[in-house]
């Protein structure tokens, strides 16, 4: 019963500090002509394989319970079917419902362990969703660099995982798959 009480307290606290997305995407001014738009992402099996092999084996799985170690070890067999799946999902602007879910895990920060505000929520999302987003992020980064919309020197954050590219890829995922 005590663990149920703790879970309820944490849930109440996390809900009280949660902000709801208004669904409005930020306006991004158009700085390139229509012929240079990023309309598609090529989910080549080699790219998917590379991203699968980069997975950290101890990465926690999300609601689909697919472990990173399994995906990494089966990269050779999974890269082609996942390439096809990602391409189809991207072209349809669709995501499996389970990829839109997360397991919320409370992580203790400091202070009294009995105070719910001393915990921060960590969202464990599906590894395949993060994998697809990672391929999209790389394509966006290449596009932005190629068209001189950003460069390595003035890009905010640490290249190549810059906040600008992460923000754009998140906005793209939300806009396409919401």
Q: Residue spans of the language-model regions?
A:
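Conserved pre-motif C helix in the palm subdomain of viral-like polymerases
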Residues: 79, 117-148, 164-177
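Short, glycine/acidic-rich hinge or "gate" loops at secondary-structure transitions
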Residues: 148-159
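Compositionally biased, low-complexity segments
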Residues: 12, 157, 163-166
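Surface-exposed loop/turn segments and immediately adjacent short secondary-structure elements
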Residues: 1-118, 123, 127, 131
